[in-house]
Amino acid sequence: MKRLKIFLYLGLVFLAYPSWMEARHIPPIVSTQWLNARIGDPSLTILDVRRVEAYQEGHIPGAINVYAGAWAYKKGVLFNEIPDQAELNETIGAVGISLSSAVVVVGNMDTVREGYQTIRVACTLLYAGLEDVAVLDGGMNKWVKENRPLSQKVVKPIPREFQGRYRTDLFADKAYVKENLGKIILVDVREPAYYSGEKKLDCVARPGHIPGAYNLPTSCAFNSDGTFKTKEELLVIAESVTGAGRDREIITYCDTGQCCPTWHFIMRELLGFPRVRIYDGSMQEWGADERAPVTK
């Protein structure tokens, strides 16, 4: 009986680490100390997604720069949409990244907009088929505060042809969300005032949220200095809306698709939730469709 319990325990541990997590060679969230020890490692690509002016003022030695805006674009009236695959192949190939590359995405994590953009870039690379993608915990602001090395040398990558293995199951469109209402766990990552309909952005036609959605603000995932909360804390927060079971599919959304990748990244890459998607169109698209239900 004791041996059986041990086997059962090991089986549960195995199930806790899905295949994509086992395939990783770097953790999804890396510390400044971890990255500092690997400066100059030819097997690691440091991708700085800040604006070029900030990059030129000082960046982590060896980092290449592609502004976060290049990794999402306006599609019709919708902001922050995932690029077409051909365009994304070109963007990734231009900076010399391959499917086997290990990439650490670096941005400023002490500002809401830039922090969310940084994580969205990481999710975009995962969508393209990379496995070893991480974000720098605390971002450049923490790196600079700790007086870690900086460089002003502009790094010119060697372009290469890139052909992604696209994980279309990481995203959901409006039709998919509509069809699966009541079957999926919808996670609205906006602040409570926007979830409740008390406030709304100008680009969102109707205030409120998708019926049945739980509110899990993205800001809950971070400490005041822009670092992530601990894995244990994040699991407790995530399970407050998803429950302990992991069988149901989870779809995250926000206003324009900019900040909902954060909880997607945390749940899937750090916590190992097996079925998590991003609704890219989010409330900007949903609210514009009069046939799509909205509640307060």
What do these predicted ranges mean?
Residues 1-8, 19:
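Bacterial N-terminal signal peptides that target proteins for export
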Residues 10, 19-21, 257:
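Cleavable N-terminal signal peptides
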Residues 14-57, 140-206, 294:
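Flexible, polar/low-complexity N-terminal or interdomain linker segments that lie immediately upstream
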Residues 43-85:
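N-terminal, post-signal-peptide region of Sec/Tat-exported proteins
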Residues 51-54, 69-73, 109-113, 140-142, ...:
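Solvent-exposed loop/turn segments at secondary-structure junctions
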Residues 73-102, 218-250:
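Helix-loop module immediately N-terminal to the HCX5R catalytic loop
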Residues 82-176, 199, 208, 259-276, ...:
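Thiolate-centered catalytic microenvironments shared by cysteine-dependent enzyme domains
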